[in-house]
Amino acid sequence: FPWLALGYSQTDAPLGQLAPYAGVFGVGWAVVFSAGLLWTLLNSADWRARLGWLGLLAALWLGAWGLGRIAWVEPAGPALRVAIVQGNVTQDRKWNPDALDETLTRYVQLSLPEQSQSDVIIWPETAIPALLDEVRPFVAALAGAAQQAGVDYVTGIPTGSWETSIFHNSIIGVGRSPGLYHKRRLLPFGEYLPLRGLLLFFRDWVDIPMADFTPGGLEQPLFRAGGQPVGLSICFEAVFGSEIRRALPEATWLINLSNDAWFKDSAAPHQHLQIARLRALEVGRYLARATNTGVSAIVDEQGRIKARGPQFQAEVIRGEVQPLRGLTPYARFGDWPAV
C-alpha cells in the first residue's frame, strides 16, 4: 500500500524535479542520499573532506534544479476550459436510494451554468450513485443537453448487472465523446475481498461497508474528452505511477476521480492531492482531479496547483488545462531505473 512514499515530501522542493526522470522512488532515493551526505558532512573531522561532501550535496540539489528546467513536453492543441463539480454529498446519504434524486439534481444544478463556458465538465467518483442500467433515462437526458451545448461530461458511476453479479467502478463520457472506463486497480477490503474463499465468512462479522467490484481489463480503449485523448484513474489508482503511464504517449492530459469523504477531516485528502500532483509531474501532463468533498484541483505538468476548491462545500472549480505531447524519461522507462 504505497501511500506515503518518501518522495512525495519533495513535490515543492528542488529534489522533486527528479520525478520526471526517476519517479517518486528516485526522488526518495535522492532524499536518503542527501541525508547521508549531510550526516557525513557534519561528522567529518577533516575540513577538506567536509568541502568535498558539501560539494557533492550541492551538486545533487543544483543538478536536480537544473534538470527541472528541461522541457520534455510541448502543447498539443489549444487549452481546454474545464469545470470540476464538487457535489459535497455526505457519505451517509450518498448510497441512500431515497437521496438519489436529490444528489442528481444537485450535480445538474451546479453544472448547467457551466455548459456554455466549458469544454469538459467533470463529476467525481460514483457521483451518480446507482448502476448505469438503473439511471439510463437520466444519462440519456444529460447526453442530449451536453450535445446541444457542445460540451463533454465525464462522471464516475458503477456499472454492471445484478443478473451476472459483475460490477465495475467506472467512468463514462457523456456528450460529444461517449466513452467507458473500468477501474483496474481496486482497493483491497474496500472494493473487493482478497482471498475470497478464505475470508468471505468474516465480512459480515467485521461489518465493513464494502462493494464487490471486478477489475477492468489492462487494455481498454483510450478515452477522449474535449477532443483530446485523456488518461483516466479512479481514486487509489493515482498512487501507482505505472497505472498513469498506461495511457501514454497518446493521452495529452489526465483526469482523476475520487471520493475522499471516507477520510473526513483528516490529513488523508491533502495527502491524496499531494500524490496526484507528483503523478502529473512524473509524466508531464495537466491533471484535473474531481472529488466528492475535496480536495478538487487542477494541476499543471510541473505539479503546481492552478486552481483548487475548498473542502466540505458544494463548489465548481474552473480553470484551463493545456493538452501536452511528449514523453518524460519516467513516462518512457517507468520505475525500473530507480528500483
Language-model-derived ranges and their functions:
Residues 1-339:
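Enzyme catalytic cores with a strong preference for nitrogen-chemistry domains
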